[in-house]
Curated annotation (Swiss-Prot):
Organism (species): Mycobacterium tuberculosis (strain ATCC 25618 / H37Rv)
NCBIfam families noted in UniProt: PRK14109.1 (NF010707)
The keyword Magnesium appears for this protein: yes
Alphabetized HAMAP family for the sequence: GlnE
Annotated region (Adenylyl removase), positions in chain: 1-487
Chemical reaction(s) catalysed: [glutamine synthetase]-O(4)-(5'-adenylyl)-L-tyrosine + phosphate = [glutamine synthetase]-L-tyrosine + ADP; [glutamine synthetase]-L-tyrosine + ATP = [glutamine synthetase]-O(4)-(5'-adenylyl)-L-tyrosine + diphosphate
Keywords for the protein's UniProt record, in alphabetical order: ATP-binding, Magnesium, Multifunctional enzyme, Nucleotide-binding, Nucleotidyltransferase, Transferase
Cofactors (names): Mg(2+)
Family to which the UniProt record says this protein belongs: Belongs to the GlnE family.
Residue numbers spanned by region Adenylyl transferase: 492-994
MF-aspect GO terms: [glutamate-ammonia-ligase] adenylyltransferase activity; [glutamine synthetase]-adenylyl-L-tyrosine phosphorylase activity; ATP binding; magnesium ion binding
Protein name: Bifunctional glutamine synthetase adenylyltransferase/adenylyl-removing enzyme
């Protein structure tokens, strides 16, 4: 018979499962402690407290180890845990959060008593005295000194962590993050004082030590230290003394052994500089050599130990330089470099888990705050504070950022720092890496350690994931808003609630710091955008902070802002435009990069704005790549064919060409196309326009019987024939005709010439679009020869009169438009000239070499730099192409694969046939690609054809970015260009025999 117990008689003790203990031996461990036998309220409360530990199993394992240590006094501890709720909260939270502090307690089992009763942390001065007393008490026992100091430091961290964590287990006061960080800095100060005392005694003995000041930097200097962090220091000496460096080195050694790593890398000249300098030496360095980041680092400087008077003199001398740093000539360049360096530090595979360096992470907050301090503290002393939280408050009070934004940024910053603290406490290791999102156990532990509770929809881990996402997004948004929203408020309509601290002068300073060379002009553009009437102005006010931030990373933010204003005014009636930028951040970010890099593409976008909608990604990738050049060509030709009037037909063709050029240029600038793909696409659209113009002109010029007197073919020459057109390339062509049946040559040529002339005139009509110039000067007899010849006339000319340069030009001949069959017959005819069965004559080769030498000395434009002229300069396009063509002239009769109009494909054949060593061919290939990228980039940046790379400066930086260089360092890009072309020139000389 089964007897059911009354509810009041059932055991009160919760089961292992209800306690959340998942280790299989958990039940045995509870039994070992005797916690499973008593059903009184004290034991029930004890077990529920244990269950609330961030990792209850880890806490239980540590308790077992403590109970097994005879020095713990387990009976006393057990009894205290049953009676003292505050002790349970402190001990269980520490053991469930920190494996390292659990190990410390097991190694020092009496330290649990530090967590009993009313725990009061010692003051800054009390800490210093206690650590120095520990040193004094250990005199004569050097072997135990480091151990005793380490134990004392860990005991303090144990107490602080227990107070910090207790609220996760029991209803204990929550210790504010700022208090925890400041208390950790106090401990670091005391530790450094003890280490300095040891070092002075070790190095100086009974003699007076040298006067040294130790300046804390970074988070220690700002009193916002982590549980585990390197402590950055700078040493200042009163005078030169050989003992200075010995004392400093010994201090760092002792501190690193007992407490934490001490790093002096922020000193002048970094690790290569002297460890200790006099104050005068520091002043001289910062006056002459220091970089912007070094002044930024000084924002956190604080004398901590050593000679206090010397430390204050150090601050008095250097801090005025910090507040003037934004006036330095290279301030903007260095700030931009620092911003990019922060982004590049994080490996892509962990970027989403990085608390410090990831997007929306701690460094975003710290960098933004420090930059605003550097810009505005020059004229506002209230901003001259060290800690990030204090600086945010001061910026809000001063009106440099909105008060609500300051409060939100502070809350996000403190939340992220709290997570950082919890991650570091676990093993007392320096880390900023969140657990893998798939590691459910680790995420749950972090959530509980951070006192995050389930919310009814998600468990603690789910709440943490949502909160992290929210905070990262908020930081990212506020990061841009901090920089730009007050600027807009200072110039916007009254409804924007003007930030009272942001004068136009201050706004200009901030824009200058963010990379704008003409800040007052930029403010005018911004004012014009946000002060538009109605909805447009309001939307711009919302959009601009983020758009301006993205644009500030572009090489030319001033030009980009002007282009954005012009584009916005041109599209004022297009409702989709601002909606797209508002709702699709990826589109907006890409557009800002394009506008801030190129003068060529923005002009096209104003007349082909729908291309902007292709800046987003589709299911298969970037929509800019969904368009096939061949499909565009077919559509262009078909569109033109619908108009009987040639001018309207070409206007339609220009519209499609404009759209395609905008697409190609955009994709190129965004790094979505290889340079060879760009050249092929540009060639394709040029050929399509040419075909459309030829078709429409033939239709409009037919005689009454609608029978064309001749067939016409257009032969592409030069880069058009090689499908290697750039943005600024001419289209070199020749026209060939063949009389229709019953039509004599003279009439056929006359009619065909009229067609060719009208096509050239129609395409060459001045336009706001990039020009469509046809150059027919490579035809027989050049400008003096007839524009159109029959096939027979060409054959007769080349057979009898062909000059070496004309033979060379024919190497690039390719039928591109008009009658395809006639075009192919032309190519077969010229094959006899360009690829003769026995090769070209030695005289022809000599003539080619002579012409090449003359071009090098005569054709380079006056004032051009031969080292950086992408077309005619050393190792430039002409060098590579002439080298390839010389080898074709010499060997094409033996190597049929050299019957090829493409430079790159011909280089492949040259290497495969071993006509030139493969390594040399690779040098030629890289030079051609490098020069082509640079030449294309020049047009994209300047908006007009040019071949000369600019000197150092913003324009060269823009060319570097447009050419796909890995950063915007124009000097680095130029060095690479010079190196690649110099090596290629050596190969050119070998091939040409000079």
């Amino acid at each position: 018979m089964v007897v059911t117990k009354l509810a009041t008689q059932r055991p009160k003790l919760p089961s292992v499962g209800r306690l959340g203990l998942v280790d299989p031996p958990a039940g045995e461990r509870l039994a070992q402690l005797g916690w499973d036998r008593h059903e009184d309220q004290a034991h029930v409360d004890l077990l529920w407290s244990l269950s609330r530990a961030p990792d209850a199993d880890a806490a239980l394992r540590a308790l077992i180890r403590l109970s097994e240590n005879p020095d713990t006094g387990w009976d006393e501890l057990n009894a205290a845990l049953l009676r003292e709720r505050s002790l349970r909260g402190r001990l269980f939270s520490v053991l469930g959060s920190s494996l390292a502090l659990g190990d410390h307690l097991v190694a020092h089992p009496q330290s649990w008593k530090l967590l009993r009763g009313k725990v009061t942390l010692p003051s800054h001065d009390q800490l210093q005295r206690s650590f120095v007393e520990c040193v004094e008490e250990s005199e004569g026992m050097p072997g135990s000194l480091v151990h005793r100091l380490r134990t004392q430091y860990r005991d303090y961290v144990l107490m602080l962590a227990a107070l910090d964590l207790a609220a996760t287990v029991e209803d204990e006061p929550v210790l504010p993050f700022t208090v925890v960080a400041a208390r950790l800095a106090d401990a670091a100060d005391a530790a450094l004082a003890a280490a300095l005392r040891v070092a002075e005694a070790s190095v100086c003995g009974e003699h007076p030590p040298p006067r040294l000041a130790v300046i804390a930097m970074g988070k220690c200097g700002a009193r916002e230290l982590n549980y585990v962090s390197d402590v950055d220091v700078i040493f200042v000496a009163e005078r030169s003394d050989p003992r200075n460096a010995r004392v400093a080195s010994e201090m760092m050694r002792v501190a690193s052994a007992a407490f934490f790593e001490v790093d002096a890398a922020l000193r002048p000249e970094g690790r290569n500089g002297e460890l200790v300098r006099t104050l005068e030496s520091h002043i001289a360095y910062y006056q002459r050599w220091a970089k912007t980041w070094e002044f930024q680092a000084l924002l956190k400087a604080r004398p901590v130990v050593g000679d206090a008077e010397l430390g204050e003199r150090y601050l008095t001398a250097l801090m005025p330089m910090v507040w003037r740093a934004c006036e330095r000539e290279d301030f903007v360049v260095e700030v931009q470099a620092m911003r990019r360096r922060v982004e590049q530090l994080v490996p892509a595979d962990v970027r989403g888990r990085e608390l410090k360096l990831g997007s929306g992470g701690l460094r975003d907050v710290e960098f933004a705050v420090q930059l605003l301090q550097l810009v505005h503290a020059r004229s506002d002393e209230s901003l001259r504070v060290a800690s990030t939280v204090d600086a945010l408050a001061a910026l809000g009070e001063g009106g440099y950022i909105g008060r609500e934004d300051a409060a939100n940024m502070t809350a996000s910053y403190e939340f992220l720092r709290l997570l950082e603290h919890r991650l570091q406490l676990q093993r007392l290791k320096r880390t900023h890496l969140l657990p893998d999102p798939e590691d459910e156990e680790a995420v749950r532990w972090l959530a509980r350690a951070a006192h995050i509770r389930p919310d009814g929809r998600n468990d603690a881990a789910g709440v943490l994931r949502e909160e992290l996402k929210k905070q990262n997004v908020r930081v990212s948004k506020l990061h841009t808003k901090l920089f730009y929203q007050p600027l807009l408020e200072s110039i916007g309509p009254t409804g924007l609630e003007i930030a009272h601290g942001m004068t136009l002068e201050a706004a200009g300073r901030r824009l200058a710091a963010l990379g704008y060379e003409g800040p007052q002009t930029a403010l005018k553009h911004m004012s014009a955008l946000v002060n538009q009437s109605g909805r447009r102005g309001r939307v711009q006010s919302v959009l601009l902070p983020r758009l301006l931030d993205w644009m500030s990373y572009a090489p030319d933010p001033d030009g980009g802002l002007l282009a954005y204003r012009r584009l916005s005014e041109a599209l004022a009636t297009e409702s989709w435009y601002l909606a797209t930028l508002r709702d699709k951040p990826a589109v907006a970010k890409r557009l800002m990069h394009v506008l801030g890099t190129s003068a060529y593409v923005p002009d096209l976008l104003m007349r082909a704005p729908r291309v902007i909608q292709q800046y987003e990604d589709g299911p298969a990738g970037p929509k800019l790549l969904e368009t096939e050049p061949a499909a565009v060509a077919r559509a262009l030709i078909a569109s033109a064919s619908r108009y009987p009037d040639p001018e309207r037909a070409i206007a339609g063709a220009r519209t499609l060409r404009r759209r395609e050029l905008a697409r190609i240029g955009s994709a190129d600038l965004l790094g979505l196309l290889e340079v060879t793909e760009v050249c092929r696409a540009l060639t394709s659209v040029w050929v399509a326009v040419l075909q459309a113009a030829l078709d429409v002109m033939i239709r409009a010029s037919l005689p009454d019987d609608d029978r064309a007197p001749a067939a016409i073919a257009v032969i592409g020459m030069g880069r058009l024939g090689g499908a290697e057109l750039g943005y600024g390339s001419d289209a070199d062509v020749m026209f060939v005709c063949e009389p229709a049946t019953g039509v004599d040559d003279a009439r056929a040529v006359k009619w065909s010439t009229s067609i060719a002339e009208r096509v050239r005139a129609l395409l060459g009509t001045p336009s706001v679009d990039p020009p469509l110039e046809l150059d027919a000067n490579l035809r027989p007899e050049g400008r003096n020869g007839p524009l159109v010849r029959t096939l027979g006339s060409y054959a007769a000319y080349y057979e009898q009169w062909a000059q070496p340069w004309e033979i060379q030009a024919l190497l690039r001949a390719h039928a591109v438009a008009g009658d395809a069959e006639l075009g192919q017959r032309f190519l077969r005819m010229v094959d006899k000239t360009r690829y003769p069965p026995d090769g070209v004559s030695a005289d022809s080769v000599r003539e080619i070499r002579r012409i090449k030498a003359r071009i090098e000395s005569e054709r380079l434009p006056r004032g051009a730099d031969p080292n950086t002229h992408t077309k005619l300069g050393r190792g430039g396009l002409a060098d590579i192409e002439w080298t390839v063509q010389l080898l074709q002239l010499q060997h094409a009769h033996q190597v049929p694969a050299l019957h090829n109009t493409s430079t790159l494909q011909s280089l492949d054949v040259i290497a495969a046939a071993d006509l030139v060593p493969a390594a040399d061919v690779e040098l030629l290939r890289q030079a051609w690609l490098t020069a082509t990228r640079a030449r294309n980039a020049l047009v994209l940046v300047r908006g007009k054809p040019t071949d000369q790379l600019p000197g150092p400066g913003r324009q060269l930086n823009a060319v570097a970015v447009a050419a796909g260089w890995r950063n915007d360092d124009g000097g680095e890009f130029l060095d690479n260009y010079l190196r690649v072309t110099r090596r290629a020139k050596a190969v050119v000389r070998k091939v040409f025999g000079s």
